[in-house]
Design a protein with these regions (language model features):
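FAD-site-proximal beta/loop scaffold in flavoenzymes
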Residues: 234-260, 339-406, 447
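N-terminal Rossmann-like FAD-binding beta1-loop-alpha1 element of flavoenzymes
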Residues: 127-153, 271-280
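Rossmann-like dinucleotide-binding cores of NAD(P)H-dependent redox enzymes
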Residues: 151-154, 158-193, 276-321, 431-446
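Mid-to-C-terminal Rossmann-like scaffold of FAD/NAD(P)H-dependent oxidoreductases
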Residues: 8-10, 14-30, 307, 320-323, ...
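Glycine/serine-rich phosphate-binding loop and adjoining beta1-alpha1 elements at the start
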Residues: 14, 40, 44-120, 187, ...
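A conserved FAD-binding loop/helix module that cradles the flavin
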Residues: 275, 399-433
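Feature captures the FAD/FMN-dependent oxidoreductase FAD-binding
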Residues: 62, 123-132, 180-228, 322-330, ...
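Glycine-rich dinucleotide-binding loop and its adjacent helix/turn
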Residues: 107-123, 181-196, 201, 223-282, ...
Length: 498
């Protein structure tokens, strides 16, 4: 049930009295549909402008239904996506970008609270597909294949679904009940999930299970190692294993990793920030990060570092570990050259820590490919695929962390959808053709009569002094704020019923 249309933020101007702050029209407009920049920037391929318009009208369930046509995990993505759509938003040229992620989260949470159900899938095709891995890419692919009428089974090596959503993102950013309930909806739609089942031989699993196609979506769960000279090393862990142990300890009541009183994390990415903040919540007195570049050159998002510092975590910039002697960590002070690369200075310092967590990146375990002749692997350790995400083996597709791309949740989700649509076409003996795209619309093409100031809504944030557990830090929008925020959308490239 939709609500009444919101009042326009900008009143209808009387052009006989004033011309406003935008350009003056001297000719009648011509209808020319264009591509909104938010849609263009979304790695999951969401039609953001469409569901924002429905949300503005108060048609929340219809907005959610439109959203899950492209992305089955809106409550998850509204929390963990780094929202490149907002960086592209034309509204940012006037005041603030539309808080798209907050509205997506609102719709996802409303669906969970109200028990909304997806539309029925297409008629059964009679085809069976095996998905290897229950991370964001595998879950997305399974969902879209199910929507298209195919029978899908996911086989997951771990004890729980979610992949890096569960074992790489702490619960203070993504509550586990939110993840569990969105996964449960995918399974309730008809997808089968088999846990604790590591696929060792893909072709054998395909043939014995009678599957017509396979999508490999194995995440990057192997930590990259670095050789650090150590006379007598203290406890050294990798960040991926540490975060996984901490997650299982929180969810299943298992003992948390033992770190001692002081812990150092080596690395400058988002995983390093998550590891440090998780360690603080596990009770360490001091958590520090050691990183060889400066703040401007770190791979972590700026807000991640700021939140870590708010929680009392010290970041040692321009420091590189040279050797370890029990609890003493010798670091060399670095400087950046003209290209921003760290170079040694010959100056050394000693830091103290009872444990060292290495957060230097992750790799995919590609041992599953050893039994598959013909699959090409690049020197970077990723699978070579065609534009339709199929490998050189007919019917064998791959996506997410396994293929060349940036490794984010939303990109992995987009890969799952893309693979599903190409797999559907392949299973039916056809080729998938992406819908025609319109030209991208920029701010100079909007022809705004008035540039009304309407600042973005703010989500409630738990103060730093209260962040002593794994409770969620950032809250959601209420109905009024969600509709207001959706109304801030310029509806770029489309009619917004003025």
């Amino acid at each position: 049930q939709c609500m009444s249309k919101q009042l326009d933020m900008t009143p209808q101007p009387d052009l006989s009295q004033k011309t406003g702050t935008g350009p003056v029209r001297t000719r009648l407009p011509v209808w020319q549909p264009a591509l909104p920049p938010c849609n263009h920037a979304c790695p999951a391929g969401e039609n953001i402008q469409a569901w924002l318009a429905l949300a503005e009208a108060g048609c929340f369930e219809a907005a959610w239904q439109r959203l899950i046509e492209e992305n089955p995990l809106p409550a998850v993505h509204g929390r963990v996506c780094y929202h490149p759509c907002e960086s592209a938003c034309n509204r940012a040229q006037v005041d603030d970008a539309v808080s798209i992620h907050a509205i997506e989260r609102f719709l996802g949470d409303e669906a969970l609270a109200r028990g909304w159900l997806p539309a029925p899938p297409a008629p059964a095709s009679g085809k069976k597909v095996l998905v290897i891995g229950a991370g964001p890419s595998g879950l997305s692919c399974a969902w879209h294949l199910n929507r298209l009428g195919h029978q899908v089974e996911i086989r997951e090596a771990g004890p729980l679904a979610g992949g890096m959503l569960r074992f790489g993102i702490p619960a203070y950013r993504l509550p586990r009940d939110v993840l569990d309930r969105e996964v449960a909806r995918i399974l309730a739609a008809g997808v089968t999930l088999t846990l604790n089942h590591k696929v060792e031989d893909v072709l054998k699993a395909r043939d014995e299970g009678g599957f017509d196609a396979v999508f490999m979506a194995i995440g990057a769960h192997l930590a990259k190692r670095v050789d650090i000279p150590a006379r007598e090393a203290g406890k050294i862990l990798d960040a991926v294993s540490f975060l996984e142990q901490a997650s299982l300890a929180e969810e299943q009541g298992l003992p948390p990793p033992k770190l001692g009183r002081r812990v150092a994390i080596y690395g400058g990415g988002n995983t390093a920030m998550d590891a440090a903040r998780t360690a603080r919540r596990l009770g360490v007195e001091e958590a520090m990060i050691i990183y060889r570049r400066d703040r401007d050159h770190m791979p972590a998002h700026a807000f991640e570092a700021l939140e870590a510092e708010e929680e009392g975590i010290k970041i040692n910039w321009l420091r590189s570990i040279r050797q370890i002697d029990n609890t003493n960590i010798e670091v060399e002070v670095m400087a950046l050259d003209a290209e921003g690369k760290p170079v040694p200075t010959g100056k050394f310092e000693t830091l103290e820590a009872d444990s060292l967590i290495l957060a230097l990146g992750q790799e995919v375990d590609l041992s599953v490919l050893e039994s598959i002749p013909g699959v090409r692997v690049s020197k970077e350790g990723v699978v070579q695929v065609a534009g339709n995400l199929m490998t050189d083996v007919p019917g064998l597709f791959a996506g997410g962390d396994m293929v060349p791309s940036e490794r984010t949740v939303t990109i992995a989700t987009g890969h799952g959808k893309k693979a599903a649509r190409h797999m559907d076409a392949w299973l039916r003996g056809r080729h998938y053709h992406k819908p025609l795209s319109y030209p991208l619309v920029g701010p100079e093409q909007l022809q705004l009569w008035f540039q009304t100031q309407a600042p973005a809504s703010s989500q409630p944030v738990k103060p730093a002094w209260a962040r002593d557990d794994f409770g969620e830090i950032i809250g959601g929008l209420d109905v009024t704020a969600a509709r207001y925020e959706a109304a801030r959308c310029y509806s770029c490239g489309n009619c917004f019923e003025c």
